[in-house]
Regions:
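A detector of single, family-specific signature residues
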Residues: 1-287
Length: 287
């Protein structure tokens, strides 16, 4: 006797709920930095409406309710409103805001929408919304290969990722500053000096080029500024790391904290690496 198949709740490649086209209002949003282009599929309405809005969540909700009213005038009782937009710099706030108001909101993985060769050549806002609409409709039907969704994190889950991401940015910034300082030394012919030393800034004025000259004044001032920036960045990195340790000590058994400590202990990685793995790789709500 074969075991019945169970639903994989973390399968974002297709929708697991049945789709009733006569009772479902479908909309996709093409987002830009200045406006939202909203395309809809409204039951009972032959035209497929397309509306450009200012970036205003209340105007979007009013538009959806207006389309719902149009469908109900045609005898279709709308029991489900499904909205989707591509993941991007706008984040997930709109999906959470819509969900709190009874709208089923999905965020499409930006690289997952199937694009035909013709659409690659001709790119317009209308084509973009058509592609999103086609991909979202296929996904709602439960068909694979149209697009994939990303899990919508809570505000707390998003915020929990900030320290690791900020630390990564700061580490990169510190590395770039040191590279710039070393490049300046190379241009002057100065070698064997470690700009990462704590006393590096105070020793700059004692350095001499192979020609026996001190570092020129403008270059010296720039080097001092870069080393001061590097000192500040390193201090910020230490603050993030200390805050992370304090949080783990306060609630070591809470949620992902236990997994962070387990990874750090079992596979021997640092706390920051373990936290990154838990938040960005192992979490089902990763973006």
């Amino acid at each position: 006797m074969t075991k019945p198949k169970t639903k994989n709740v973390n399968d974002f490649s297709r929708c697991l709920d049945p789709l009733d086209m006569d009772a479902t209002l479908i909309a996709v949003i093409e987002m830009s930095q200045s406006s939202w282009l909203v395309a809809g599929i409204v039951p009972g309405v032959e035209r497929e409406p397309l509306k450009k809005l200012a970036i205003d969540e209340h105007a979007l909700l009013n538009l959806l309710n207006r389309w719902r009213a149009e469908a109900e005038k045609q005898g279709h009782r709308i029991t489900r409103i499904a909205v989707a937009f591509e993941a991007g710099h706008d984040g997930f706030w709109l999906a959470r805001w819509l969900a709190a108001r009874g709208v089923e909101a999905h965020v499409i993985h930006a690289s997952s929408v199937a694009v035909t060769r013709e659409h690659r050549r001709a790119k317009t806002d209308r084509l973009d919304t058509e592609l999103l609409k086609r991909g979202f409709l296929g996904w709602l039907r439960g068909e694979r290969g149209h697009c994939k969704m990303v899990a919508v994190p809570t505000l707390a889950e998003e915020d929990a990722k900030r320290p690791s991401r900020e630390r990564e940015t700061l580490v990169g910034e510190a590395s770039r500053l040191i590279t710039r300082v070393k490049s300046a030394f190379v241009r002057l012919g100065i070698r064997g000096f470690n700009p990462k030393l704590k006393a590096a800034a105070t020793r700059l004025e004692t350095l001499r080029t192979p020609e026996g000259e001190p570092i020129p004044p403008n270059t010296l001032a720039a080097l001092k500024r870069d080393l001061e920036r590097h000192r500040i960045v390193k201090q910020q990195i230490r603050e993030i790391e200390q805050t992370r340790l304090d949080v783990l000590k306060q609630a070591p058994e809470k949620g992902p904290h236990a997994m962070v400590l387990l990874l750090a202990r079992v596979i021997g990685v640092g706390v920051e690496t373990a936290d990154m793995l838990v938040r960005e790789v192992l979490s089902p709500a990763r973006d």
